[in-house]
Amino acid sequence: MIRNIDELSYMMLKKSLDATSARDRVIAHNIANVNTKGYKAFRVVFEEKLNGVLKGERLALKVTNEKHLNDGSGIENLSYDLKKDNSSSMRLDGNNVDIDNEMANLAANAILYNALVSQANSKIAMRRFIISEGRR
């Protein structure tokens, strides 16, 4: 259970970094299969779920034991989803990977990842400063 806003921001950063890392792997997998006959691209869905949690929507939960209770309202339960892109293809082989789109997504994801890492580093530096009471 998250107890304060600082824990919430760390958890959001962690979940966002997990999703952007997964998206990077998925995009790389799509690019690697650009010439595979019949291959359908995959997408990582995360931002919509994050926005829903921030608006107070409940998450569908997975439990390992039916006796475990959880209301699904916290960011602790948030994770990304993998979705197969079943859109049609202009190619004759049925592959729907657009290399230009994938490269643009890869660049945008790298920028987002770097921004999240910078934010996390700033939070850690601030905590380190507070712990040392401002002394160097």
Task: Show the residue positions of the predicted features.
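Amphipathic alpha-helical polymerization modules
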Residues: M1-R136
